[in-house]
């Protein structure tokens, strides 16, 4: 770590269509090989599809999906003596958002629909309704933290 401390977080610019930093983060997670225009098209079409299917504001749908996907606890490996313990720790808000978006995009890519727009749209709708693989991942993470609660005193 540098002597000056950690580098400051750069402010995230809100996207031009929905004026939401969360949508910008989602575009950045979808982005592959520098093709920002393609990533924006995928995200905007998926959000429009959410509007048509659910009849609500797509940013509200995205936020509700994120609330259902963001973890509050996770486990971190901690070596004590010769043993490695999975120690449950609370997740900082910025990391929770990053993990939630990462899981949404990962499990959207793994879906079986034909286009990425359909996959992302359906994963967002499932997550906003408390279903889907990303929500299951969060539940698994919480379950892991719960089962390792005995090692919570090893926190650092």
UniProtKB/Swiss-Prot annotation:
The keyword RNA-binding applies. CDD domains: uS7_Bacteria (cd14869). GO terms for cellular component: small ribosomal subunit. GO terms for molecular function: rRNA binding; structural constituent of ribosome; tRNA binding. Disulfide bonds: none annotated. Part of the 30S ribosomal subunit. Contacts proteins S9 and S11. This is Small ribosomal subunit protein uS7. It comes from Salinispora arenicola (strain CNS-205).
